[in-house]
Amino acid sequence: MTDFFNENLTSLHKKLVDKEISATELTKEALNKSKSSQSEINAFITIDDEGALKRAAEIDAVGIDPDNILSGIPFAIKDNIVTKGLKTTAASHILDNFVPVYDATVIEKLNELGIVTIGKTNMDEFAMGGSTETSYFGKTANAWDHTKVPGGSSGGSASSVASGVIPVALGSDTGGSIRQPAAFNGIVGLKPTYGRVSRWGLIAFGSSLDQIGPLTRTVEDNARVLAAISGKDQRDTTTEDQSVPDFTKGIKKGVKDLRIGVPKEYFAKGIDEGVKDVVKKAIAKYESLGAKVDEVSLPHSKYGIAAYYILASSEASSNLERFDGIRYGFSARQDGQTLEDLYVRTRSEGFGDEVKRRIMLGTFALSAGFYDAYFKKAAQVRTLIVNDFAKVFENHDIILGPTTTSPAFDLGSENDDPVKMYMNDLLTIPLNLAGLPGMSINAGFTDGLPVGLQIIGKRFDESTIYKTAYAFEQDSQLFTKHPGVNF
């Protein structure tokens, strides 16, 4: 049996090329792990036995490409990334019977490289949440403690990787939805620069904020997957025509003389003391490895939460207008009802409470008489946050701090307090507002739960993020630690 805890893309690829294992055998193992873990972590909405085995057999028939490290590798895909012929729900009742007729650009790219999609992972409904508890398909559990949340909204992707169920998963990040689950589950999660990866085929939440990114157990694996999904896409005008480097090149150069800034605001009141302690020790390790560390300030980051929930909710209220029960998805049709009745019933019954809350908030912020007071002001705050980062990066290469304000919290403990739930994204949201790349890696543990170290880079400088992360990962060897589960 393949132990994904002790494998990486390089070792799996070697076994496939050397025919120690076939793509079909590897796929069967991933499918079995996915199904056996469901009762405990509920990481998947859909597990595609038939499609995955058919795909693996096709790859075996052609043969593993020795020059392509992703050939025959099982992947899990967050359920807001459309997959042709495979149900895609965004974890919502309103889409619980939706089967796309096309693949997202990232799926096209990965399919060309020979991956095998095992299934679609659980998430907060329409990616709106920080705990993977708002899903129509039930809650997902944390890999390290099944009474804790896995983070959100990409909780299914993170928990499946951290539990050794799957080697690689894709997530999406609008305000921290890759990095927060990565932190809570002790794995590697990257939000790329806005415009690095195509959003075509990603069910939109906040169009100026959303980005697709990889979740993996190691930094080098993460770098390989990012390279595979990056690049200009004519179907997504927000992608930028940037060359896609080999992100693994230079990853082992170390961090000597790297200029690191540590924002004082990221260690302010309200950040869990255990988290602070673990992250400060990680930053001290960088100094011992030769990096130059000093304190910096991001003075407007404290306004990020307020600005984000106006801007993101406003974009969501527009993006979610298309779900009306007419052409696809759930419909509350009844004989004799008016069109307005159909819209009201479909959306009232099809959307969950958190999604309806954000639609209402966004519609209010965009309404006549309130636009200047809310949306325009939030957009101005966003500009100030962009400028804060730009100023710091004039004299620094990387910014380090905690990914989250606390370790994973109890399932159900914050469902009745939306503001408390929103505050969990305090340290991740500023990056989305600024369009910057950011990664979470495991920095250590507090009370037996993982703590994330957030590594923030300049626009389109994911290479320096990977180099920075790799140095700590290899020194700490924390990637060798894993939960006491065996699916």
Curated annotation (Swiss-Prot):
GO-annotated biological processes: translation
Enzyme class, UniProt record, top EC level: ligase
Active site as annotated: K78, S153, S177
Assigned GO CC terms: glutamyl-tRNA(Gln) amidotransferase complex
EC number: 6.3.5.7
PANTHER family the UniProt entry points to: GLUTAMYL-TRNA(GLN) AMIDOTRANSFERASE SUBUNIT A, TRANSAMIDASE
UniProt xrefs under NCBIfam families: gatA
Function per UniProt: Allows the formation of correctly charged Gln-tRNA(Gln) through the transamidation of misacylated Glu-tRNA(Gln) in organisms which lack glutaminyl-tRNA synthetase. The reaction takes place in the presence of glutamine and ATP through an activated gamma-phospho-Glu-tRNA(Gln).
Name recorded for this polypeptide: Glutamyl-tRNA(Gln) amidotransferase subunit A
Gene: gatA
